[in-house]
């Protein structure tokens, strides 16, 4: 991607920048940046906000020197074109240093050590979800190299961040994060993001197997979908953007995303921002954990690897899961106080998926609202005051329908954003009027191609019981039942 007008390029940064950086003014104050983040309902890319961060120099080579031979866990995946997602439960893992990773990634024939069994032409490696507090436990000063306070979150730095280092082809399967929203700073190399709005959830065929708290996975390999098995995916609205060094991507709450490294080495830093809705989400996640662990351990108490994501150390007992659930409900009540406030919040969260007009469109609780085709006067005013421009570019829907061929997918590269008439910035207004209808449609379409129309597996049952729409309703019933 070409450098944007007035931007400090990666080459400028590498050469020091000097006086030019000192003169450069960030396009948004911390207060304005936070306002945008807390109000924006679609993904967008920030420009010219991190040119003075020390972390902009954190290449994999630099980090290998900082870590001094520290062992890191890498996820090893195959460079395949399968139609099935490559979940983390299907990957192998190696413990290696960044020096070993860089040597292997350079395709040296004399490679040995942890990567010796993995042909670089057939495998990719990904050091993902590396929390700074563990990775740099003896170098805490480095936390200050990441300055999320520039986005309006005082005191937030590397301590609340994770690091991602990958080779060409490394990716995360399509999923949504149940908690918060996400800021992603691209440091080295480029990553391609495939994003889908929350209201497209029925078309992404959500599943909680493999189980990981805070992640809802899609059954679909979105870059090579099996449309015969998952025909509803044709209705999903793909948004694509290639994130380059020096850019920061904002991922709103509950947006699905599949992320792939498209350069030989990529380095990213992200931070999940807590939101008000997380209080109820904790109840939903506790319900999910209890049901998944109960059914899957009953099915096969000795084989957790097949269903428990490697990020989860072990399955938790029913007693512990009951403790989690009661703790989440207690925390919800402690936060909201009176029973009237609690019930109002529960009802409000329920309506966010069905009645758009009853909620403030310019707030995070409105991310997944339904709505008609007529724009209110308030909506028009908001679009007229759109924050988008040269330094904040929206990620808009792709120009073509998803294809099973990778070459058939087009993307928004962040350069050619639309004009401020509001017609192309917002999400297309399409949403089921009832959350139950969305659940039924997803479940029905998921059974279109099955070996047997009558056999129901434990996973089939769980796909219904812990469908995000179902656990949301159950959580609301639990909360409302205790608010009287």
From Swiss-Prot:
Q: Key word Cytoplasm present in the record?
A: yes
Entry GO CC: cytoplasm
Region feature Disordered, mapped onto this chain: 1-26, 396-429
Q: How does it assemble?
A: Interacts with CRYAB and HSPB1.
Which is an annotated Pfam family here? Cupin_8
* InterPro entries noted in UniProt: Cupin_8, HSPB1-associated_protein_1, JmjC_dom, RmlC-like_jellyroll
Keywords assigned? Cytoplasm, Stress response
SMART domains recorded for this chain? JmjC
Name used for this protein in its record: HSPB1-associated protein 1
Q: What does this protein do?
A: May play a role in cellular stress response.
> Start and end of every JmjC domain?
124-288
Tell me yes or no: is S-adenosyl-L-methionine among this UniProt entry's keywords: no
Q: Where is this region: Interaction with HSPB1?
A: 88-208
Q: Where in the cell is it found?
A: Cytoplasm
One GO term in the molecular function aspect is: 2-oxoglutarate-dependent dioxygenase activity
């Amino acid at each position: 991607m070409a450098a944007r007008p007035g931007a400090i390029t990666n080459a400028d940064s590498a050469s020091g920048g000097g006086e030019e950086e000192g003169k450069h003014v960030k396009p948004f104050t911390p207060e304005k940046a936070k306002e945008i983040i807390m109000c924006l309902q679609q993904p967008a890319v920030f420009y010219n906000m991190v040119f003075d961060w020390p972390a902009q120099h954190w290449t994999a080579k630099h980090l290998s020197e900082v870590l001094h031979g520290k062992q890191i866990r890498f996820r090893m995946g195959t460079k395949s074109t399968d139609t099935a997602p490559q979940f983390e439960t299907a990957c192998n893992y190696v413990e290696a240093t960044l020096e070993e990773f860089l040597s292997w990634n350079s395709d040296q024939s004399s490679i040995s050590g942890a990567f010796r069994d993995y042909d670089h032409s057939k495998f990719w490696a990904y050091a993902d979800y590396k929390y700074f507090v563990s990775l740099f436990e003896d170098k805490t000063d480095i936390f200050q190299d990441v300055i999320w306070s520039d986005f309006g979150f005082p005191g937030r730095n590397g301590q609340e961040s994770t690091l991602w280092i990958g080779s060409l082809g490394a990716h995360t399967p399509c999923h949504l994060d149940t908690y918060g929203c996400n800021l992603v700073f691209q440091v080295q190399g480029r990553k391609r993001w495939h994003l889908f709005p929350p209201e497209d959830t029925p078309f992404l065929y959500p599943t909680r197997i493999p189980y990981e708290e805070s992640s809802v996975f899609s059954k679909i390999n979105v870059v090579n979908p099996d449309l015969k098995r998952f025909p509803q995916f044709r209705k999903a609205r793909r948004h694509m953007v290639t994130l380059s060094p020096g850019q920061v991507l904002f991922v709103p709450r509950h947006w699905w995303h599949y992320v792939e490294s498209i350069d030989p080495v990529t380095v990213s830093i992200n931070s999940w921002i807590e939101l008000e809705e997380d209080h109820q989400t904790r109840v939903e996640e506790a319900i999910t954990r209890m049901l998944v662990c109960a059914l899957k351990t009953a099915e096969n108490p000795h084989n957790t690897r097949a269903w428990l994501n490697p990020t989860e150390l072990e399955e938790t007992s029913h007693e512990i899961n009951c403790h989690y659930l009661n703790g989440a409900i207690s925390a919800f009540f402690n936060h909201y106080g009176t029973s009237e406030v609690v019930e109002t919040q529960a009802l409000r969260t329920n309506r966010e998926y069905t009645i758009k007009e009853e909620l403030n469109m310019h707030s995070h609780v409105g991310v997944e609202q339904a709505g008609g085709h007529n724009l209110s006067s308030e909506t028009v005013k908001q679009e007229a005051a759109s924050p988008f421009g040269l330094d904040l570019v929206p990620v808009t829907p792709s120009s073509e329908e998803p294809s099973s061929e990778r070459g058939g997918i087009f993307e928004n590269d962040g350069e050619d954003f639309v004009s401020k008439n509001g017609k192309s910035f917002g999400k297309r207004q399409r949403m089921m009027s009832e959350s139950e209808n969305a659940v039924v449609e997803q479940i029905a379409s998921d059974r279109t191609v099955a070996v047997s129309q009558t056999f129901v597996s434990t996973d089939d049952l769980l796909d219904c019981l812990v469908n995000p729409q179902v656990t949301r309703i159950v959580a609301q019933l639990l909360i409302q039942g205790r608010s009287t």
